[in-house]
Regions:
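Short helix-initiation/N-cap motifs at beta->coil->alpha
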Residues: 36-47, 134-163
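Short, well-ordered beta-strand elements
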Residues: 3-14, 32-38, 105-106
Length: 195
């Protein structure tokens, strides 16, 4: 980055930026300055890293990284595995998966890897059917749903799912990435189901 001892890292604010802020003083004791750049979405930190504006980023899981590389012709690599954030299915005024009404809207992230994770979670909970053998490695999209059981599945940018859920009608559901759920004041214990 700007100097041999400056490390510029892009991250989403919760929990990634918070974790980086926690280690900032420890790195300073070792002679390094940690420059944290906060992003609201999942695309810009990878673009900034690929363009050399960052030394690293911290926000994604390996399937998302692989999908980003394939879609953007980049060759970004994971330097380390740090933690895993659970994906949760949240209900607005819905106490359990069994209480979901026909015609309910279910909002899920639209990017390849997280759409796959969301759809597999919905299948796990019996809310949709997918083809035999559907898996995270090969990926699935809403086009692969063989039976939506009368639910309206809507895909949106991952960083907007929590906000749309918070403004949704009672009876709606959303599958929310762990970091965005935390930022919205939700925890995995609030979820109807987790992957």
């Amino acid at each position: 980055s700007d100097g041999d001892n400056v490390i510029r890292v892009g991250a989403t604010s919760t929990p990634h930026g918070e974790i980086l802020n926690f280690v900032k003083d420890t790195l300073a004791d070792e002679g390094y300055t940690l420059d944290i750049v906060i992003y609201d979405d999942y695309v810009l930190p990878n673009k900034a890293l690929a363009d050399g504006e960052l030394d690293a980023n911290y926000f994604q899981h390996t399937p998302y990284l692989n999908s980003f590389n394939a879609s953007n012709g980049t060759d970004l690599v994971a330097a380390a595995s740090i933690h895993y954030e659970p994906f949760g299915l949240y209900g607005n005024g819905v106490a359990s998966v069994a209480d979901v009404k026909e015609g309910a809207t279910i909002v899920i992230p639209a990017d390849d890897s997280n759409e796959t994770r969301a759809l597999l979670l919905l299948k796990q909970e019996g809310l949709i059917d997918l083809p035999e053998g559907a898996n995270a490695t090969d990926g699935v999209t809403t086009l692969d749903i063989t039976d939506n059981h009368g639910y309206n599945i809507v895909t949106v940018q991952a960083d907007t799912v929590a906000a749309q859920f918070n403004n949704s009608d009672e009876g709606s559901l959303a599958v929310i990435n762990g970091n965005y759920a935390l930022a919205a004041g939700l925890s995995s214990s609030d979820a109807l189901a987790v992957e």
